[in-house]
Curated annotation (Swiss-Prot):
One of its GO terms (cellular component) is cytosolic large ribosomal subunit. This is Large ribosomal subunit protein bL25. Residues 178-217 are annotated as: Disordered. InterPro entries: Rbsml_bL25/Gln-tRNA_synth_N (IPR020056), Ribosomal_bL25/Gln-tRNA_synth (IPR011035), Ribosomal_bL25_b-dom (IPR020057), Ribosomal_bL25_C (IPR037121), Ribosomal_bL25_long (IPR001021), Ribosomal_L25_dom (IPR029751), Ribosomal_uL5_bac-type (IPR020930). It comes from Staphylococcus aureus (strain USA300). Keywords: Ribonucleoprotein, Ribosomal protein, RNA-binding, rRNA-binding. GO terms for molecular function: 5S rRNA binding; structural constituent of ribosome.
Amino acid sequence: MASLKSIIRQGKQTRSDLKQLRKSGKVPAVVYGYGTKNVSVKVDEVEFIKVIREVGRNGVIELGVGSKTIKVMVADYQFDPLKNQITHIDFLAINMSEERTVEVPVQLVGEAVGAKEGGVVEQPLFNLEVTATPDNIPEAIEVDITELNINDSLTVADVKVTGDFKIENDSAESVVTVVAPTEEPTEEEIEAMEGEQQTEEPEVVGESKEDEEKTEE
């Protein structure tokens, strides 16, 4: 569990105020949820990024708010890709004994046997819905694909649960599969297809010879 300091924002702030705030390296944020009233705060962007890298997207953070320390999770955040800047954060105060359902990323581990033979690894499911208390939510769920051959697949039912959490997805939902490579045409086949295209004469649209003779009469 990582710690992060915040400073309470007093009064109503204009767009210009928020723009200057972000320009100074701070991110406007709000804290709400279990055992607390809504509080507007600001946090240092660099420090926030460090904390998220340490605990993960669903990690628990000890957020200093005034004289209090509140256990929070990041409920949501906004990011401006043009400015490469976090523009707002929602911190959710949590009850550590209350279960929550969140999305956890799937991390493929190993190299599939089928991939070594030319197969292509496809991953239709990148996140799993997980229910657990905040301290038991995994940062990622590893799925070992080492033994997968071409045309093999793994479903949610095949995912090994190594912690105190429950996966909510349909057990039959596909997580990863190894498909056969797409066969590309050989040079001979390409030449044959080009030859067929060249021998095909375009259909001429116009008067027939018979029509021309009638016209001359």
